[in-house]
């Protein structure tokens, strides 16, 4: 929670006064598709990214109401092949390559996109949650898309002993 939710808040708050003084700037927070829907074995991660999404959206609305030329983009990518999610299985939606995500993030910033789910279309999860009964939503995303079982074989990034940790 400190890294995924609080750190982006503190970084943005450090730069925001100068952006407001210049009346230009852009805050881009990288959240996660995991912050858009519940997912077994990801409750804390999902909650931390949900916090980043909510905070970013609130700041965006505040800046918009003040007629500021400072913009906010929130990006919610699916799993990215960085090693962090080693072992994740995705039946329909491909695991994303970092280069692909970077290009989409840059494009979203250049276009002042408020919210970008990656891959495209993934941002419609919110819409689906709003209009579908929970049982139907869970069936589609859990059984058909397979998101609720993506973490079944999760191993995560392998830890490397750097020799810097102290023995207890």
Question: Locations of the language-model features?
Answer:
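Catalytic tyrosine of NAD(P)H-dependent dehydrogenase/reductases that use a Tyr as the general acid/base
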Residues: 9, 45
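Active-site helix of classical SDR
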Residues: 12, 48
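A short helix-coil junction within the Rossmann-fold of NAD(P)-dependent oxidoreductases
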Residues: 14-23
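Residue(s) in the substrate-gating loop at a strand-loop-helix junction
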Residues: 32
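Conserved catalytic-site region of short-chain dehydrogenase/reductase
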Residues: 35-37
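Active-site loop immediately N-terminal to the catalytic Tyr-X3-Lys motif
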Residues: 39-43
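SDR active-site lid
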Residues: 62-124, 135
């Amino acid at each position: 929670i400190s890294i995924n939710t609080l750190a982006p808040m503190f970084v943005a708050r450090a730069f925001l006064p100068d952006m407001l003084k210049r009346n230009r700037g852009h805050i881009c927070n990288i959240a996660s598709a995991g912050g858009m829907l519940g997912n077994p074995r990801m409750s804390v991660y999902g909650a931390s990214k949900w916090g980043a999404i909510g905070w970013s959206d609130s700041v965006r609305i505040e800046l918009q109401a003040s007629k500021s030329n400072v913009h906010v983009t929130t990006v919610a990518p699916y799993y990215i092949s960085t090693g962090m999610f080693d072992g994740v299985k995705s039946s329909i939606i491909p695991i994303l390559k970092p280069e692909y995500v970077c290009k989409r993030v840059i494009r979203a910033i250049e276009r002042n996109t408020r919210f970008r789910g990656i891959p495209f279309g993934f941002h419609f999860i919110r819409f689906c949650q709003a209009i579908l009964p929970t049982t139907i939503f869970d069936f589609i995303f859990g059984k058909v898309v397979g998101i609720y079982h993506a973490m079944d074989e999760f191993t995560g990034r392998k830890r490397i002993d750097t020799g810097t940790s102290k023995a207890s």
